[in-house]
Amino acid sequence: MRILLPTGAATESLVRRAAAEYDADVVVTGEIASFLTPHALRMLLKKKKYDCVIVSGMCTASFEQVERETGVPVYRGPRHAADIALVLPLIGTMELSRTVPADDFLAARKAESALRRIEEQEKDAIPDFLIRGVKIGGGSRMKVLAEIMDAHRCGDIRSTVEGYHASGADIVDLGFGFDATPDDVTRVFSLLADLDAPLAVDTQDPSLIRAALGRADIVLSLQETNIPEVGKDVAMAGVAVVVVPGNTTLTKNIALAKKAGVRCIIADPLLQPVGSGFTRSLSGFRKFSCPVFFGAGNVVELLDADSVGANALLAGIAAEAGASIIFTSEHSDKTRGSIREMRRATEMMVLAGNRPYPKDLGIDLLVLKEKRRRREPPLEYTASATARPMPDEITCDPRGNFRIGIEGDRIVAVIHGKAVTGKRWQDVLYTLLSQGDISLPDHAGYLGRELYKAELAIRYGRSFEQDGEF
């Protein structure tokens, strides 16, 4: 297959090295590869016959008309020339996209394939039992249970529950503190009665447990003090239970639950936080004759570290321990996003089932770090100057000063009582420039920096402080 690789002078050597072993012509069409025009490509295709063209993934032009005229398919290559070596071996084995850069396209294809494998494995899995249609145990994927603490105090419980399910929770657990009443429990579950998704109640109070049995699918925290009181009621309701150890052992409490007639039992050996017996508590996660519950959320909430790595590692430990349900929460600001992170982590563990390590799976939990850094070609220049320090004196823009902030998922820039809002920093800056609100170049540079900081704060769920460090 003969390939045409139009490129720029800045990346020519890199592309030539990558294409050396292929039947490919590397042609420089200008200084920058992404500036290739349909006319320039049309002229190249008139000179020689090719089976396909791979243009820079950064090209913004449409080559649809050129393809119609010449019959030669024009595909998007990677956005970065350094990645062309990863794409060329695939030519002829699969069709690249005409509109999406090859690196994005291939990553999406791998992710789609990975998610299909997860879906197929879940479809074929034979569970220990079902909870409102959700498979628990057996060979099914480890299910994510997300907690809402003090559910009776939640302002919009329905939206919160729906949001948790949308984020990836298989089960939403409604916790009720010591100040909750049976009426509180009844009210909360009545607001969710028509939701066709698994809900759990988390309380040790027998009266609160009874109040939840009309809708709850799982009861958490049964042990020797409440099983004698509500065990038969729970059994009659046909709901599943999570049994924990108390003053007696977990094994004895499971036996108590069985004696009461409960059939769907999940064992929770109680995972302890780091520093309070975490390693020792892992020894309790032995093989049980029933599904096992892994309380990862308690560990993450009590660890001042980014949640994404902690959730990934705990999901791996839970998978090795044979857990069927993994608990997570978003109670604190630092754990926001844990539901989505934990769902992805459980999917990674499914894909890692037949591998020695959970890597190169098609999906990952890399957020800030890269799996592999690109080795870009060095910049070419003939002269350089050392940057001078920015002067301490500030020249105020005569048009006025801005206050930058964030509201939900939007960036807000305010001047003279008028706000411009947007989701992308460049859109906000462009609007401010178009309105004539900025007259000094250094003010524009400053605003670009602050607006981008605001966008990053939204993306990563962080606080934003104008003029502060990110």
Regions found by a protein language model. Give the residues of each.
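N-terminal amphipathic alpha-helix/helix-capping segment at the start of soluble metabolic enzymes
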Residues: 1, 86-159, 403-406, 464-470
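Catalytic alpha/beta core domains of metabolic enzymes, predominantly
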Residues: 4, 11-22, 76, 237-369
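Hydrophobic faces of well-ordered beta-strands that scaffold small-molecule active sites
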Residues: 55, 74-76, 142-148, 170-174, ...
